[in-house]
Amino acid sequence: TGKYPFICSECGKSFMDKRYLKIHSNVHSGNTFPCTECGKSFAAKQNLKRHQKIHTGEKPHKCTECGKQFLQKNKLDRHHLSHTGVKPFSCFECGEQFTWKHLLQYHQLSHTGERPFVCSECGKGYKTKASLALHCHIH
């Protein structure tokens, strides 16, 4: 609760706004918006419209610095940090900073030694899913 006080009685998922809970309820009632290309369904029509751009290749948000284009504005906003040097994600162990959350999470494995991606064939562990996928080609 607290920041997300509106809770779905069907699945327990919580929302910060009552409107989002109402939209989410479409998932349980079957009142969703399916993609005609791939069949994936969405609780909100605007989410379907955003998804459909994946199939058209449309990337309407363009970086004014380098010209790179993005499907979603929030991805462009995060990309802008690569030009400013701002790194909002800090390691609590050593203070090293990162532009992307997933890079911080990968870095934190260097402190713990954790290798969460394990080969089902030989049991060898890897820090990333990509490293495991490369390894799996040897079997």
From Swiss-Prot:
Cellular localization per UniProt: Nucleus
GO cellular component: chromatin; PcG protein complex; transcription regulator complex
InterPro entries attached to this UniProt entry: Znf_C2H2_sf, Znf_C2H2_type
UniProt zinc finger (C2H2-type) residues: 6-28, 33-55, 61-83, 89-111, 117-139
GO biological process, alphabetically ordered: regulation of transcription by RNA polymerase II
A single GO molecular function term of this UniProt record: DNA-binding transcription factor activity
Alphabetical keyword list: DNA-binding, Metal-binding, Nucleus, Repeat, Transcription, Transcription regulation, Zinc, Zinc-finger
PROSITE patterns xref list: ZINC_FINGER_C2H2_1, ZINC_FINGER_C2H2_2
Summary of the function given for this chain in its UniProt record: May be involved in transcriptional regulation.
Family per record: Belongs to the krueppel C2H2-type zinc-finger protein family.
Annotated protein name in UniProt: Oocyte zinc finger protein XlCOF14
Lineage of the organism: Eukaryota, Metazoa, Chordata, Craniata, Vertebrata
